[in-house]
């Protein structure tokens, strides 16, 4: 909002399609705001990027219908957790992945993650202080896959509660460590 005000001179209300928990990175985040600015739309992203921290980059700007709202019109969101499952970890990606040196049972995690698919009440997978009226959410796709020493947990759904994905990922790690049986998830 401050960067937009710097280039337009207007106070705007920025609506993002979602919030990110601490330590979570957003790729493909969509946001909208109303402006009377005369800056050409094809120059807007460049102008805003010149005022943002280096950790935030606007990829594209486009005009949308006045009724559009990034969060309310969002159809689905995907979260991906990356686990480095090597004994030593890596320094270069330490802010983008979680290092778990104990060998994880990926097959058990793959079995367990499927129990999260569908419409469920996820009240057991939300942090305290969650203000959502309902804890019912739909997960369209849930998967665990491995590439080398990295294990990926991906959840795509219609919305997520505060810390819900982090708690699900932690539960799947517990399954991978043999502390919880996959069949105990439902």
Residue ranges of predicted features:
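Structured-RNA-binding interfaces characteristic of tRNA pseudouridine synthases
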Residues: 2-186
